[in-house]
Amino acid sequence: MVETYRLNEQQLPTIPVPHDCVIETITMENQWLVFSFEQDIGDRDSVKEIMPGAKSLTIKFHLVDEEFCLYQWHKPIKFLASKGFYKQVDSSLLYQLASSKFNLEYLNHYVAYQSLMIEMCALTTIRLELSVDSVEFHWN
């Protein structure tokens, strides 16, 4: 089953969030950024309400611009430092994050007109900012 959400229309969609689901692979295919999630994703609490009985999920983001920004949360090493910051990192690291030994989990996303900001976690918080005109959820 395929669900399509358009981010280039006057009314923005409410896109479901596969919260705490592990992203296994991230690829780029003809202006589509593709997140492939773990098998048996329907066992996750956040997915049970969205799509009960789902075996797998692939999310495809159609990019308006193939450039995107990737940020990683950093906190100073100082013991008493209470504040951290997001530091921009090389966007090519995105593809390596899913294949690292630390599970890359999808946390949430923020939707705006032709824009999407995705928060993920792999040992630290990762923020991805994209220019997107449509999002497709492929459920199996």
Predicted regions, residues:
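Surface-exposed, interaction-prone regions used to assemble/regulate multi-protein complexes
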Residues: 1-140
